[in-house]
């Protein structure tokens, strides 16, 4: 049986461990004084492009500018006149002072700024909406194959916008199409408010 152990004896630190028998599955230590930005979405401005690093630095309001590597650039930023097998660099996709929406993937650590992405993901109760990544559709691999097939049909019936990806979370198992549709509509409204 899995157990969750919570240690909150120190006012500035919270420790949570998940165990099964004598095996530690997960350990999370949260410092209350630290500002957590992971998962947050910000409107930022490209402050510097570093082709040698294949990355850009983005001012999104934190103490240090965030680090945006080329692999985290959403397809919408790639040049439209792409030729077969043509390779791009970060300077082909972004310009200095360009405003972009970014999501924090990793919080600041030491002297390094936060790791950022433009491939946004919005998590709902049953679904995850990928508003600028149409190829990121799927169903949680934790579900059995029979349930996955049922959910696949339900997701297709949702008629999500073609440019957006939808992933069904494990919590979506056994949910009726109305609940999934409600979750999708909520996430679409959140995305609309962000943009």
Across the structure, where does each feature detected by a protein language model lie?
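Single-stranded RNA-binding surfaces
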Residues: 1-195
């Amino acid at each position: 049986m899995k157990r969750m152990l919570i240690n909150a004896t120190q006012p500035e630190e919270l420790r949570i461990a998940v165990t099964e028998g004598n095996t530690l599955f997960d350990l999370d230590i949260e410092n209350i004084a630290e500002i957590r930005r992971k998962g947050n979405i910000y409107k930022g401005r490209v402050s510097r492009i570093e082709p040698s690093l294949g990355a850009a630095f983005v001012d999104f309001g934190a103490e240090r500018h965030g680090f945006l590597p080329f692999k985290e650039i959403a397809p919408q930023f790639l040049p439209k006149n792409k030729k077969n097998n043509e390779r791009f660099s970060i300077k082909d996709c972004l310009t200095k002072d360009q405003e972009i929406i970014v999501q924090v993937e990793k919080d600041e650590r030491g002297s390094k700024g936060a790791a950022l992405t433009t491939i946004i993901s919005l998590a709902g109760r049953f679904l995850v909406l990928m508003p600028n990544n149409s190829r990121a559709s799927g169903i949680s691999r934790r579900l059995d194959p029979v349930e996955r097939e049922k959910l696949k049909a339900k997701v297709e019936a949702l008629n999500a916008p073609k440019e957006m990806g939808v992933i069904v979370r494990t919590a979506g198992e056994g949910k009726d199409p109305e609940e999934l549709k409600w979750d999708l509509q909520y996430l679409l409204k959140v995305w609309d408010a962000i943009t």
